[in-house]
Amino acid sequence: MPLGIGALTSLQTLSKIIIGEANGFKISELKGLMHLQGQISITGLHKVFNAIHAKEVNLQQKKGIRDLEMEWSDVFDDSRNENIEYEVLEGLRPYEKLRSLKILNYMGMKFPNWVGDPSFVCLTQLTLRGCKSCTYLPTLGHLQSLEKLFLESMNGLQRLDSEFLRPINSHDFGFPSLQVLEFRDMQGWEIWSTNGGDKDVSFPCLCEISIINCPKLAEVAIDLIPSLEVLHIEECSVSVLRSLVGVSSSFLELSLKNIKGLTQLHGEVLKHLGSLEHLYVTRCDELRYLWESESEACKILVSLWDLRVKFCKNLVSLGKNEVNLDSDSGICLESVRKVELFNCPKLKSYNCPNGIQNLDIYGCRSITSLTFPTLQDLPSTLKILSICYFDNFEANCLLNKFLSSLGYLSIARVPNLSSFPEGCLVHLTKLIIRGCDNIESIPEKGFGFLPLFCLRYLEINSCKNLKSFPHEHLQNLTSLEELWIRDCPNIDYTFPCVLWPPNLTTLTIGGLKKPMSEWGPQNFPTSLVKLSLYGKNSGVVPFAKSEEDVRNRNNTTSSSFVVPPSLTLLQIHGFMELESVLEELHHLTCLEELLIRSCPKLRDLPEMLLPKLSRLWVDSSSLELRKKCGGRKAKYWPVVSQIPDLDVG
């Protein structure tokens, strides 16, 4: 902090205040700054050893402060004194019209009486974090306007009871306005009990509860909270779930992560979830089934439309009885519209709802099939289909079904895919085929290039045996904006210059069978703004400034890439003999990003373009070029040092 701040008596904005050592900024210097406004953060309060100095700051009279953060060090050692810190915090009572208050790493065993005082009628958000010595909380239920309460890393706190939420008057509600309540990293917390009093005294507006990393919490006995709609539980025991799920019948969202002891959602839990719309289950390693009975789940979860199960390594099936369920039985969660199943390696099958719209399955390597209870084809409602890392999945059977409704199709790392569907993908806007090593061709008729008027994104990537690709129809993709064709070493096409999609804005291409030096002349569309060329150990990238430049070259059959001046990003990767791109790139006056990878002989850059760049990356293979860019005495340093995103050494 600069010296003399305290003399600026008209100062209104001072968002960060750092208390210094003996010769540094002292908290008493804030005494005369009566006009401070808005958000104020005071850090280093552990360096205040005289509570009188804290009281002299007179925060209570600084009426312009609306958001206040008070922070001590997160190191709790012998240099700290809990009694002094209590007195300091007591002396820093703010103005009663405060909107937001954060108290961080305070060492006192208790809080001063002003924390939770009902006179703070405008306080809407309160955060108590890292106050590890605190053994009990003040009565916060008095705060009439409080909407959000965050309690984090209060390791000394073992019990929360009705005193925590007690209202001002016996006939009032505790926390009458609270909407969001979060407990996080409460390592010593064991009991949360509000029972024993009037059943209607607390949380009339509470919508969301989050309990995260509270491993010792075992006893939860709280009153009904009819307004509660969202429940997040993470790194807790299953008893917390069983207790909290019964406090409301209005749950819309339930998120469970790393719940110890959770083997399935038993009937005693399911029966409270009739209104549930979103169910998220993550990293529950003891989970083998989501529920005992598929038919029971169907009867209860009638509103569920978003189901996500991720990283549950022992999950065998969503329903225990589904293991032997006939796919024609018609039993499934018909209301579900969106399903994400990620990295559940033992999951063998999934019975999809007939009305599903979005199906995304990743890394479920044991799945061999997807079934639809009453349909022979994929449902007409399906808009998004993404399947990735399926070792034994019969992809050909699935993808040969009717696909006309799809708007997004992504197939990645599916080794059994050997052919592309022959259905007409008339509504497709995004298509990704990545890492499918057994597919050899994408037939013109089967791919349906001619009707793909809606396609905006096409990626064919890392398909090592792909040979046939209907490149001659690229020019018909009039809506295509982004095209990736990369690392397909058996594609033997040269992409004649007149066949590029006319409205292409992004092109990533390279790593094909024939090096770019043998492609012949290329005239990229004038709409192009991002170009990434992957030479895959090719010699040079044959840039040309214009078509006239191409005609003037001695060998008119040689490769020449005419890059449009509209380009804003250029990436050059894997051109082993490329030495210079000086003249060929001077016309790229709109260029903002230049990325160079694996071009070991490149020694020069288009110097006149460098001042306009916002991003320049040169990797370690281009040793000579890096020397010219790195260091104050380097050739390009005066210019490149001004580039915001620079990586040249």
Residue ranges and their predicted role:
Residues 1-649:
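Innate immune receptor modules and recognition interfaces
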